[in-house]
Amino acid sequence: MFKRTVILLAGPTGSGKTAVSLKLAPLVDGEIISVDSMQVYQGMDIGTAKVSLTDRKEVPHHLIDVCHVQESFNAVDFYYHAVQACQDILSRNKVPILVGGTGFYFHTFLSGPPSGPSPDFVLREQLTLEAQERGISALYQELELLDPVYAATITKHDKNKIIRALEIIRKTGSKVSSYAWQSTVNESKEYHCRRWLLSPDPELLRHNILERCDQMLEEGLLDEVQALLAAGIKGNSSASRAIGYREWIEFLDLGSPPDLFEITKQKFITNTWRYTKKQRTWFKRYSLFRELRPMGMTLDDMAKKIAQDYFLCG
């Protein structure tokens, strides 16, 4: 089977992957697919370092602002959205460039989502009627009792996912969370993937993170968190626990005490750095990503290197 080529550009927070991708896209006539578990949410802009609207006009981006903060979005959702975006981009003879730092999403894109039982439309209809009669909150409470692990990954507003989960449980007697993911990353069955990992020196990465956190606060992160609280972000456990949001949600809930500002800021920086180290560990676990060390290279240099590889192998 002939496979179309796509580019994967991964890296930890603060590695410069967004800046490189904006240089790369014009070189290969590409469009960018965000591989970030939080950039899918509307209103989570500053804290997720979303690319600016100006840059999005220059280079089309996909999988940004696709859902409300009260909705859940997981790796399975990402897989189907990303495949659809790839097909759309390729149909216009453009090059998909998947860019981000959510390793599990890259894993899912390469290996596919976990398998599950086939749909039972009769049972689904019964559950839909139950939702109308009892309310979707009652079904969510039932799911929390039967499969608390999976229930914690969605919200009480996710009607379709709640019904599908209960459908699986009632049909098979097994928890949704028991369906295992692939433990290894494989070659995508759909695409020929050129995989790159930006891997800056740890000291440079730490410096970038310090600057990044300061810049987010200067750009109005606290105002953004306040707006998200009004929009109901607490109804989504994943979004409200995201680094850069959970620290400041707690700060605002306490009444924004001035004496806790610096403590909260340091917690924000520390948590970001810890997450970055986890990202680096995750990506280096898989030899399928080719490391690109920025030392001595400009953004243009890195973009050209990836583009040359694409044209040689694409």
UniProtKB/Swiss-Prot annotation:
ATP binds at G11, P12, T13, G14, S15, G16, K17, T18. It holds the Pfam family IPPT. Substrate binds at T13, G14, S15, G16, K17, T18. InterPro entries: Dimethylallyltransferase (IPR039657), IPT (IPR018022), P-loop_NTPase (IPR027417). It comes from the Bacteria. Its cofactor is Mg(2+). It catalyses: adenosine(37) in tRNA + dimethylallyl diphosphate = N(6)-dimethylallyladenosine(37) in tRNA + diphosphate. Its EC number is 2.5.1.75. The record marks T102, R124 as: Interaction with substrate tRNA. Gene3D superfamilies: 1.10.20.140, P-loop containing nucleotide triphosphate hydrolases (3.40.50.300). GO terms for biological process: tRNA modification. Catalyzes the transfer of a dimethylallyl group onto the adenine at position 37 in tRNAs that read codons beginning with uridine, leading to the formation of N6-(dimethylallyl)adenosine (i(6)A). Monomer. This is tRNA dimethylallyltransferase.
